[in-house]
């Protein structure tokens, strides 16, 4: 905090450096001096009339950050839009190409039909036997059906479309770039082989130039040793050797520079080839990882679809199918038993007309058999429930009061009778489930399948 007294000494003003604001502790009139001068330690001039130096909130940093974020977002949106346009153009190109291939197939089919109907192309007379030539390809094509010929042309166009679709898939997955990299590697290998051959050639020429110059220098040295006994031919030879030595030196220097240039070029090609091969294997590894990841997600999606279909079949279709089969079976059994009862009643009426009442009672018993057959499943469930609850029964018997030994004996006998009446099922007997038990069994089976597939 800095304290400064304004126009009147009795009005102290408190200046906060952290908030960069002026706050009057007690005032009767506003303060007209600049906070900037107070921040820099300058004393304001009391006679100054500048009232526009009050510091406003600075939003430059905020605006700069917003502009940076907006520029980054705008760049991302432009890249996304350009990528979308590229894929849209590729898709439209493939669709137009497929349309053109279909139109080309239709055009070929119409041309074939016009050729069949053209009289100039229907000459089929054999000059040796004056008979008709049979088995011509056009005649065979004429006997074929139109849809078969159209299908053949469509398959021909479809083959090209499949190749184009494969190329488009490679473009989407990025394998086209890897193929271009492979072709560039093969070209670089060819260039490297040519450069090596050229290097060997220039190196041999450089060695020959060195030998020629050394030989000419030896001849010059021999001539200089017998300079006192030179003849006119020796003088001409010396002059010629001197000129050739200069030419050989120039040629040797040129060949030396070429050999150095070829060596640097060969080293550069070797480095580029090495880097290209490393890049190729790296990109192929990335591509294979992407394809493997995509196949993994595809497998998960297919597994999810299979689980969904299994749940739908087991929880919706199978109960409906079972209910329908049971209902139709019960209806058939009822109708068969009713017909059998009617036939028996008619026979008994014919044999014993006086005992019709007994026959009607027998018919009622037959109808009760049908009802007992329908309620058989419910009894089985009750029996299984009684098997599962022996502890409850024993608990109830133990909680009751035992007044005498006779009462205890009667209760034990009743317990044995109850246990004897329980119908135990064999191991190979079919299981009987109600709807809730079947749903619980299906859900547990599906959860175990998901758990096992996740562990694998």
Curated annotation (Swiss-Prot):
Transit peptide region: 1-30
Membrane topology: Multi-pass membrane protein
Mitochondrial intermembrane side: 318-435
GO cellular component, one term: mitochondrion
Entry coiled-coil feature ranges: 71-128, 178-277
Role, per record: Required for the maintenance of the structure of the mitochondrial inner membrane. Involved in mitochondrial morphology. Causes growth arrest when highly overexpressed.
Protein name: Sensitive to high expression protein 9, mitochondrial
Upper classification of the organism: Eukaryota, Fungi, Dikarya, Ascomycota, Saccharomycotina
Gene: SHE9
């Amino acid at each position: 905090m800095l304290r400064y007294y304004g126009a009147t000494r009795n009005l102290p003003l408190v200046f906060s450096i952290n908030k960069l604001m002026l706050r009057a502790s007690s005032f009767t009139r506003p303060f007209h001096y600049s906070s900037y001068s107070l921040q820099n330690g300058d004393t304001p001039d009391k006679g100054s009339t500048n009232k526009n130096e009050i510091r406003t909130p600075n939003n430059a940093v905020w605006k700069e950050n917003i502009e940076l974020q907006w520029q980054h977002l705008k760049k991302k949106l432009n890249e996304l839009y350009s990528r979308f346009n590229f894929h849209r153009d590729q898709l439209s190109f493939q669709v137009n190409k497929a349309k053109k291939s279909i139109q080309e197939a239709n055009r070929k089919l119409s041309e074939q039909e016009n050729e069949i109907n053209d009289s100039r192309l229907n000459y089929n007379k054999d000059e040796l036997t004056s008979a008709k030539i049979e088995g011509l390809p056009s005649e065979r094509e004429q006997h074929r059906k139109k849809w078969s010929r159209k299908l053949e042309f469509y398959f021909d166009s479809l083959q090209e479309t499949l190749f184009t679709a494969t190329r488009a898939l490679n473009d989407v997955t990025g394998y086209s770039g890897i193929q271009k990299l492979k072709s560039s590697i093969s070209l670089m290998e060819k260039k490297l082989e040519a450069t090596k051959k050229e290097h060997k050639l220039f190196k041999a020429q450089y060695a020959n130039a060195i030998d020629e110059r050394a030989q000419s220098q030896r001849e010059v040295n021999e001539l200089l040793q017998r300079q006192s006994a030179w003849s006119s031919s020796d003088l001409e030879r010396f002059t010629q050797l001197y000129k050739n030595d200069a030419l050989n030196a120039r040629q040797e220097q040129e060949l030396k520079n070429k050999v150095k240039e070829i060596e640097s070029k060969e080293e550069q090609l070797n480095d580029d080839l090495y880097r290209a091969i490393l890049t190729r294997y790296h990109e192929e590894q990335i591509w294979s990882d992407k394809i493997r990841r995509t196949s993994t997600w595809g497998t998960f999606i297919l597994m999810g679809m299979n689980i969904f279909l299994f749940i739908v079949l087991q929880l919706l279709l199978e109960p409906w199918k079972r209910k329908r089969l049971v209902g139709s079976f019960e209806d058939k059994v009822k109708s068969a038993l009713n017909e059998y009862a009617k036939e028996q009643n008619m026979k008994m009426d014919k044999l014993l007309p006086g005992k019709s009442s007994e026959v009607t009672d027998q018919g009622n018993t037959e109808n009760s058999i049908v009802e007992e057959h329908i309620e058989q499943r419910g009894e089985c469930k009750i029996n299984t429930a009684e098997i599962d609850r022996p502890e409850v029964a024993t608990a109830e018997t133990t909680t009751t009061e035992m007044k005498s030994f006779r009462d205890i004996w009667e209760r034990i006998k009743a317990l044995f009778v109850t246990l004897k009446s329980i119908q135990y099922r064999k191991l190979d007997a079919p299981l009987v489930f109600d709807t809730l038990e079947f749903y619980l069994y299906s859900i547990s089976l599906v959860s175990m399948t998901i758990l096992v597939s996740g562990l694998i």
